[in-house]
Amino acid sequence: MSNNWLERTTLLLGEDKLQLLQRANVLVVGLGGVGAYAAEMIARAGVGRMTIADADVVSESNINRQLIALHSTIGREKSELMAERLRDINPDIELTVVNRFIKDDETDALLDSDKFD
């Protein structure tokens, strides 16, 4: 895929910095009110690898504040919806989807599962 969609980022940061972003690997845990917006902006910045984690499903009460919450998405898994959205923004993104809640005692294992920037 062409990187034309990143031309404004390249103008702002330069080619070398864009390549750093494209090699970066980011972890986003929780895709609710803040996490989904963060994940989307990270993807739009050109980050090349991302792990997203959430086990929740969209409920009607999420619609007023969550990016992926729509009447048409009620009952669907937030992690899968976000994955679809991120791949639509950047088809080249390497995405790992963790469809479970991350408990305190699992944090270290998740952080050790990959090299995150």
Each predicted region: which residue ranges?
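Electropositive phosphate-/nucleotide-binding environments in soluble metabolic enzymes
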Residues: 3, 11, 15, 32, ...
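A generic local structural motif
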Residues: 12-16, 39, 104-109
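Glycine-rich phosphate-binding loop and adjoining beta1-alpha1-beta2 segment
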Residues: 47, 52-90
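Glycine-rich adenosine-cofactor-binding loop
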Residues: 22-43, 49-54
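Solvent-exposed alpha-helices and their adjacent loops that cap or buttress functional pockets
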Residues: 19-20, 43, 110-113
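N-terminal charged helix/coil linker that caps or initiates catalytic domains
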Residues: 1-26
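Short amphipathic alpha-helical segments
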Residues: 39-41, 64-65, 111
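A structured beta-alpha segment of the ubiquitous adenosine-cofactor-binding alpha/beta core
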Residues: 75-116
